[in-house]
Amino acid sequence: MTDPVPPRIAIVVSQFNPEVTDGLLKGALDHLAAQGAPVAAPDIIAAPGAYELPLIAQTLARTGRYAGVVCLGCVIKGETAHFEFISLGASLGLMAAGLQTETPVSFGVLTTYTDEQAVARSRDDAENKGREAANACLSTVQTLRRIRENALA
């Protein structure tokens, strides 16, 4: 990261499927710290599940304290249509939160067909999707800063 002042980033993490979301959180925290934007414990917010992520993310973004919000969760397909409703609601809600607040809200919600797929995407390696969501958030923060600075020039 090349910004002189590191951006303050919040992380919202679903408490459902913690064996997966804990790995996503570790990936996001490790990446943000490595990029010079460590996240303090008070800036890590628990959400009951993926469906609650959008409201919490939007509320955090509206405080004006955060340059971006990383959202992490895991929805694994079961035997009913619940998977589709939760996945779509979380996806559209997080996109709307970012658009309405003009604050980067990244989508680090796994939507997998099996437990094995979820575990593979939350391992402590370069393919960790929490890491990717944190990277997307930081990259978007930097892009928006450049756009806003150029608009003022």
UniProtKB/Swiss-Prot annotation:
Pfam families noted in UniProt: DMRL_synthase
Residues reported to bind 5-amino-6-(D-ribitylamino)uracil: F16, A50, Y51, E52, C74, V75, I76, F107
Name of this protein: 6,7-dimethyl-8-ribityllumazine synthase 1
Protein family (similarity comment): Belongs to the DMRL synthase family.
Matching Gene3D superfamilies: Lumazine/riboflavin synthase (3.40.50.960)
Gene: ribH1
Species assigned in the record: Caulobacter vibrioides (strain ATCC 19089 / CIP 103742 / CB 15) (Caulobacter crescentus)
GO CC, alphabetical: cytosol; riboflavin synthase complex
Pathway stated in the Swiss-Prot or TrEMBL entry: Cofactor biosynthesis; riboflavin biosynthesis; riboflavin from 2-hydroxy-3-oxobutyl phosphate and 5-amino-6-(D-ribitylamino)uracil: step 1/2
An individual GO BP term: riboflavin biosynthetic process
